[in-house]
């Protein structure tokens, strides 16, 4: 394994800012080894040295717990119920039903707004 030398970048480099703002230049940056995170104040001399540690991420398609009181879910749930309603279904009967279990849904890819809802409704 080859170690890449650590590059400490100043948060605010005045000479670079001047060149970019006055000479219509384009700045090109290359990430050599890893992402960095910093709490550099504007105009400060603190260097970017803190390693960004990736946390556990939810995979696309893995079930996630939903908030049953969420305003965001009212329309998808109503559409899902209306498409799968049993014979003899009426809006009045649907209004008095409630969810009995916490629901799970795979998170939708960013390019689509789609839910797979599984619910248990009882009077």
From Swiss-Prot:
It comes from Gadus morhua (Atlantic cod). GO terms for molecular function: cysteine-type endopeptidase inhibitor activity. Bradykinin is released from kininogen by kallikrein. N-glycosylated. Contains sulfated N-acetylglucosamine and O-acetylated sialic acids as terminal elements on biantennary and triantennary N-glycans. Keywords: Cleavage on pair of basic residues, Glycoprotein, Protease inhibitor, Thiol protease inhibitor, Vasoactive, Vasodilator. Inhibits papain and ficin (cysteine proteinases) but not trypsin (a serine proteinase). The lineage of its organism: Eukaryota, Metazoa, Chordata, Craniata, Vertebrata. It comes from the Eukaryota. GO terms for biological process: vasodilation. This is Kininogen. The keyword Glycoprotein applies.
């Amino acid at each position: 394994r080859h170690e890449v030398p650590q590059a400490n970048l100043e948060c605010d480099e005045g000479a670079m800012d001047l060149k970019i703002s006055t000479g219509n230049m384009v700045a090109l940056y290359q990430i050599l080894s890893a992402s960095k995170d910093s709490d550099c104040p504007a105009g400060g001399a603190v260097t970017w040295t803190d390693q960004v540690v990736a946390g556990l991420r939810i995979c696309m398609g893995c079930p996630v717990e939903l908030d049953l009181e969420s305003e965001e879910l009212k329309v998808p749930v109503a559409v899902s119920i209306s498409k799968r309603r049993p014979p003899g279904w009426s809006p009045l009967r649907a209004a008095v039903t409630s969810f009995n279990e916490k629901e799970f849904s795979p998170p939708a890819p960013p390019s689509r707004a789609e839910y797979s809802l599984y619910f248990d409704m009882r009077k």
